[in-house]
From Swiss-Prot:
It comes from the Eukaryota. This is Protein SPA1-RELATED 3. One of its GO terms (cellular component) is nucleus. The keyword Amino-acid biosynthesis does not apply. Residues 301-329 form a coiled coil.
Length: 845
């Protein structure tokens, strides 16, 4: 083998791989897996510069040969990997790398080829520690020296094969790969300055390190020389050196087979094997077959297999642990949910028991009434008239409650109740069950607030959004007093059994929510100028008695109508009792609650006007605003005080008697609405185009008492529901209910409710409040009514437009409700749309 090595010796520079620099352009990988023997022989000879020729078909097969692998992004030079400062010696890893290189060299030697360039700079490692052969510039230089010893014909053949391989490599390379590798080269050059082993210096010394003793004395390279180089490589694998100077000293000592003490102590077996490979006499070095059959090579393979099996077992255990952790986490969360559910069920059971006890007390106190005399035997037996069993379905409970309620009302009125009527349930009415989830969430919200208030020693009833102001019951009645209490006198409901706790506010809210189900048209306001294109109604307002209501809009007129005459008289055209003409489009109206005939208006020119309706004349004009005034309000507690909000970013306070402003609040955005609370003239709320609601104490107008943040678009309306609760409307499609008593910090970002169901994205659609009921318009041409207790609509009504030519009702998607107003504390309201249609509506059961 050695005797024939001289003529066949080739450096890797003469293989089928072109010259490469240290940045490792595309490579060919040598291995011996799944390759037919004859093909392996010819391929290896081609790679190492054999003089044998290939058939064209075999040449073409090299591109897909399993031995060939293109350089992948992330591959690193074995030299760079060895010289990493942070590299620690992993025995299995080092032996795995060494064994791969031994197999590469053995493949060459089996064909009588001396590899010559068994040096770290001529190999690359993948991210999976897979070693592949490449050729660097240093390999070419050193290889050229060795070629001078060989015949010229062999050199020419090698050059020919190199050119052939270069053309193939260029053909298969993508332009983008070259660009990436070029960028990587630049980065490497920049990093060279900071590296402890600059590549240029290392490559210059590497050739001398890996030169065998016989080559130093002028002998040609042999297979034994490759074995010597393997010994040097094995030493570098197991003996990392931290500094450049120490590296030079260590490698110089290695020439004399002097090993550092640390490798002798830590790796005696590897050190002994290394000295065998580095023997100065070539004949005393092991052959490649001896290497491959040695325990040093074979035993690590067995150990590696055991290690891989152990790793696989560990991975499977970790997978099981991950699954176990996942299942335990699910169990923990489900247990937490079960605990919460258990607490919820316990809370519900306690509340049911409390309600049943209250029911018994109420019915015992009312046993003298004829309504309950027929059911006295139920109370004496200790059973309530209606109790909810744990195993009873909610729908069945609701059905039985409905039947009992209908039966009681029918017996009171002396009417027989048929079975079919008794069989109707709240489920069939669908409102309760359709909104069951929302009602449930409000119930739990009420309970949480009650428990929190109880913990802090506060009362829920006074400020609860579910209860009426000051704990009073509903004051709202229909025009014919259709909403009545058939059960007991008022004094009966003011007894101790209905005071405090969560039951009263939630029950009141639920009853109020279920009291009405629809809006009915009581009357249509028919005007003579219906064909006028400028009929948009911007404002509606009732006087203090609810007898007169005023309309105003873009037609620059204030029209006063008598409500009862419109409801009772079926006329083709309704004429206003008073009509006041302005000079500009009108935006807002407000009656004086103290002076019956006095009404205030604002217009698009920024003027606030006071009118005397009885004399049909203008009393006062106030012109201090610089831009359009959107909203005005006269204080009920101080009827001489008026507030106005304008596009000029100011809120002005006016003395009606003096006709001048007495105060100004400046803001950074347009003011769209203002509102006094009904019981005070010392505070004021207004909404702004900056999406916020501001609440001021007018005795300190420099800073707001509270800022309510929650809307995402312009706040178009604000109305006080009661002295401590405020509702705001925005063009973000929502109404929000705010508790002013929860704003001790000056910022309130948590509304009690967000009412959704209507559509409001760009227009002013109106807002009005009456005893807990909140009416608003929608850009779908509908009127929506909410109750402050729940976030979903109680009812809605769709306006149908009348065609001016045919008189028929038609749908017009461009129309929207533009204004709305309750008639005092009644179930009646008046609404107008953008087409000028005005309807008087009434809530019905």
């Amino acid at each position: 083998m050695e005797g024939s090595s001289n003529s066949n010796s080739r450096g890797f520079n003469t293989s089928g791989v072109s010259d490469r620099n240290t940045e490792f352009l595309p490579v060919e990988r040598l291995t011996t897996r799944s390759k037919p023997s004859s093909h392996v022989d010819e391929y290896v000879r081609s790679l190492f510069g054999s003089t044998s020729t290939h058939k064209s078909g075999e040449d073409d097969s090299l591109g897909i040969d399993p031995f060939v692998r293109s350089l992948e992004w992330g591959d690193v030079s074995l030299r760079q990997w060895l010289d990493k400062p942070e590299r620690s010696v992993d025995v299995f890893e080092c032996l795995h790398v060494f064994r791969q290189i031994v197999e590469i060299v053995n493949a060459a030697h089996s064909q009588g080829i001396v590899v010559h360039n068994v040096r770290p700079s001529c190999f690359v490692m993948s991210s999976f520690n897979h070693v592949s052969f490449i050729e660097s510039a240093s390999c070419s230089d050193s290889g050229s020296d060795s070629l001078e010893d060989g015949p010229i014909s062999q050199k020419e053949i090698g050059s020919s094969r190199r050119e052939e391989a270069v053309s193939k490599a260029i053909a298969i390379e993508e332009k983008g790969v070259y660009n990436k590798l070029l960028e990587r080269k630049i980065e490497k050059l920049e990093e060279e300055k900071t590296q402890p082993f600059p590549m240029k210096h290392i490559l210059a010394m590497e050739t001398s390190w890996y030169t065998s003793p016989e080559e130093d004395f002028g002998s040609s390279s042999t297979c034994a020389s490759d074995v010597y180089r393997l010994g040097v490589l094995l030493f570098e694998l197991f003996c990392p050196v931290p500094s450049r100077e120490e590296k030079s000293r260590t490698m110089s000592s290695l020439r004399h087979r002097v090993l550092p003490p640390q490798i002798l102590l830590k790796c005696p077996k590897e050190a002994s094997f290394c000295l065998w490979l580095l023997h100065p006499e070539p004949t005393c070095r092991p052959s490649m077959s001896d290497l491959l059959q040695s325990e040093f090579i074979t035993e690590p393979r067995d150990n590696l297999e055991e290690r891989e099996a152990a790793i696989e077992l560990r991975d499977r255990i970790e997978e099981q642990e991950s699954l176990l952790e996942f299942l335990l986490l699910i169990q923990q969360r489900k247990q937490e949910s079960a605990y919460r559910l258990q607490d919820t069920v316990s809370l519900l059971s306690s509340d049911i028991e409390q309600v049943v006890k209250r029911q018994l007390i109420l019915k015992k106190r009312g046993s003298s009434l004829s309504d309950f005399s027929k059911d006295d035997h139920q109370y004496t037996s200790g059973q309530p008239l209606m109790s909810f069993q744990a195993n009873e379905e909610p729908s069945a409970f609701l059905a039985s409650r409905k039947r009992v309620r209908q039966g009681i009302l029918a017996l009171e009125n002396g009417v027989e109740v048929d079975e079919e009527s008794q069989g109707s349930t709240l489920l069939e009415s669908s409102r309760l069950m359709r909104n069951f989830k929302k009602l449930e969430s409000v119930y739990f919200l009420t309970r949480r607030r009650q428990m929190k208030a109880a913990a802090s020693g506060k009362s829920l009833t006074r400020h609860s959004p579910l209860s009426s102001e000051n704990g009073r019951g509903s004051m709202i009645v229909s025009e014919k007093s259709s909403v009545s209490n058939p059960v007991a006198p008022k004094a009966f409901f003011n007894n101790d059994s209905r005071q405090g706790g969560w039951i009263d506010p939630f029950l009141e809210g639920l009853c109020r929510y279920l009291s009405f189900s629809q809006l009915r048209v009581k009357a249509d306001l028919k005007q003579g100028d219906l064909l006028n294109s400028s009929n948009l109604v911007c404002a509606l307002a009732f006087d203090r008695e609810g007898e007169l209501f005023a309309t105003a809009g873009v037609n620059k007129k204030i029209k006063i109508f008598e409500c009862n005459s419109i409801v009772n008289d079926n006329r083709d055209i309704h004429y206003p009792v008073v009509e006041l003409a302005g000079r500009s489009k009108l935006s807002s109206l407000c009656w004086n609650s103290y002076i019956k005939s006095q009404i205030a208006s604002s217009n698009f020119d920024g003027v606030v006007q006071i009118w005397d309706v009885a004399r049909s004349q203008l009393v006062t004009e106030m012109k201090e605003h610089k831009k359009r005034v959107w909203s005005i309000d006269i204080s009920s507690a101080d009827p001489t005080l008026l507030a106005s909000g304008s596009d000029d970013g100011t809120v002005k306070l006016w003395s009606i008697n003096q006709g001048v402003s007495i105060g100004t609040i400046k803001t950074k955005a347009n003011v769209c609405c203002v509102q006094f609370p009904s019981d005070s003239g010392r505070s004021l709320a207004f909404g702004s185009a900056d999406h916020k609601v501001y609440y001021y104490d007018l005795r300190n107008p420099k800073i707001p008492l509270c800022t309510m943040i929650g809307h995402s678009k312009t706040v178009s309306y604000v109305k006080f529901v009661d002295s401590s609760t405020l509702v705001s409307s925005s063009t973000d499609n929502t109404l929000k209910l705010w508790d002013l008593s929860m704003s001790a910090s000056g910022i309130n970002e948590s509304p009690l409710h967000s009412f959704t169901g209507h559509t409001n994205l760009k227009n002013f659609v109106g807002l009005s409040v009456s005893d807990g009921y909140i009416a608003t318009g929608s850009e779908t041409n509908e009127v929506f009514v909410y109750h402050k207790a729940f976030p979903m609509p109680v009812m809605s009504y769709m306006f149908n437009n009348t065609d001016s030519m045919s008189g028929l009702e038609v749908d017009d998607a461009s129309q929207f409700i533009s204004s709305i107003c309750w008639r005092g504390q009644s179930s009646t309201l008046v609404a107008a749309n953008s087409n000028g249609n005005i309807k008087i509506l009434e809530m019905m059961t």
